């Protein structure tokens, strides 16, 4: 019969082994590819979020995020600029300049703006600038405009990245963009924001994912899954893997282990679930994958995409 100390060690080990998944410590470092930071108390205020959004309209800075993210295994984050004000790109670059936790930012520029080339070249000279995000409708307009196409080509020529946000139709736009600019790295934001009712995903979305992922220069974020679950009608406090499994299976079968990344969409993501719940979903899904595949999705692919 084991002595008392050995028995205590066995019980402690067993308890850790059989804890529910959400109580387990993180098993791999996370490079969060999607956070927003802003300060409504600035003299000029902010264009987003609006004052009517009481949960978001507050000062949100990196130190606030680090307090809750680091204990979950987050080692750094890519900031996504939500403000359309050109100078807010510089505000973020200044915020990130001396912070090793923030290896890169994705700005917000309009390729149909007359001063776009000037703005892009200016920001591209700064070490942490990696490109900009655009919504689906504006990208469509740019692709239909001669100057817009030239400006997107400039983005590619400078070795920068394009992130695209919107609903499932954005996947068709991404397909066209990837065909026209095969050297431009493109990131689908929030898995194309398909409302998830916990059943089989919409055919439009599934077909779009297959089309977009057929281009090696296109990556996709596992992000806003909890938000999509809420949009699809989920009412529980904790969004479980089973509710999102079908969506994750499509993403995995489309992009594989080398072109998926993880993003929290913090602080917006907290409207749908806790930061822990947000990261628990891909963690649980990837439990059956190899250690190399888990590292790829949680940090390695982001390092390759953003060059950090």
Locate predicted features.
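Active-site metal-binding loops of divalent metal-dependent hydrolases
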Residues: 35, 82, 191, 265-266
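Mid-to-C-terminal alpha-helical segments outside catalytic/metal-binding sites
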Residues: 2-33, 53, 58-76, 249-250, ...
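Short aromatic-enriched loop/helix-cap "lid" or pocket-rim segments at secondary-structure transitions
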Residues: 41-46, 118-119, 199-201, 232-234, ...
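Short, small-residue-enriched loops and turns at beta-alpha junctions
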Residues: 84-85, 112-114, 138-142, 194-197, ...
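Mid-domain alpha/beta scaffold segments of enzyme catalytic cores
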Residues: 24-158, 164, 168, 242, ...
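Residue-level preference for long, well-ordered alpha-helices that form the structural scaffold
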Residues: 54-58, 88, 144, 201, ...
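Catalytic pocket-lining loop regions of alpha/beta-barrel enzymes
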Residues: 141-261
């Amino acid at each position: 019969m084991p002595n008392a100390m050995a028995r205590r060690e066995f019980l402690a080990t067993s308890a850790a082994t059989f804890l529910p998944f959400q109580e387990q410590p993180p098993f791999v470092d996370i490079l969060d590819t999607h956070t927003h930071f802003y300060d409504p108390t600035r003299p000029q205020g902010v264009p987003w979020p609006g004052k009517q959004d009481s949960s978001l309209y507050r000062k949100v800075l990196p130190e606030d995020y680090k307090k809750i993210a680091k204990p979950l295994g987050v080692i750094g984050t890519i900031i996504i600029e939500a403000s359309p004000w050109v100078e807010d790109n510089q505000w973020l670059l200044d915020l990130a300049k001396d912070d090793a936790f923030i290896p890169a930012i994705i700005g917000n520029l309009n390729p149909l703006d007359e001063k776009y080339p000037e703005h892009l070249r200016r920001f591209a000279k700064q070490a942490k600038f990696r490109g900009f995000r655009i919504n689906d409708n504006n990208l469509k307009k740019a692709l239909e405009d001669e100057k817009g196409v030239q400006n997107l080509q400039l983005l590619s020529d400078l070795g920068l990245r394009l992130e695209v946000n919107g609903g499932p139709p954005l996947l068709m736009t991404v397909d066209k963009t990837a065909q026209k600019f095969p050297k431009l790295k493109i990131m689908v934001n929030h898995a194309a924001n398909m409302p998830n009712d916990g059943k089989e995903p919409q055919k439009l979305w599934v077909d779009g994912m297959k089309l977009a992922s057929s281009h090696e220069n296109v990556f996709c974020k596992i992000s806003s899954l909890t938000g999509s679950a809420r949009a699809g009608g989920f009412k529980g406090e904790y969004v479980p893997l089973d509710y999102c499994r079908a969506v994750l299976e499509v993403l995995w079968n489309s992009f594989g282990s080398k072109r998926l990344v993880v993003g929290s969409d913090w602080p917006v993501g907290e409207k749908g679930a806790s930061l822990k719940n947000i990261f628990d979903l891909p963690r649980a899904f990837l439990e059956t994958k190899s250690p190399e595949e888990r590292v790829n999705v949680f940090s390695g692919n982001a390092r390759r995409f953003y060059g950090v």
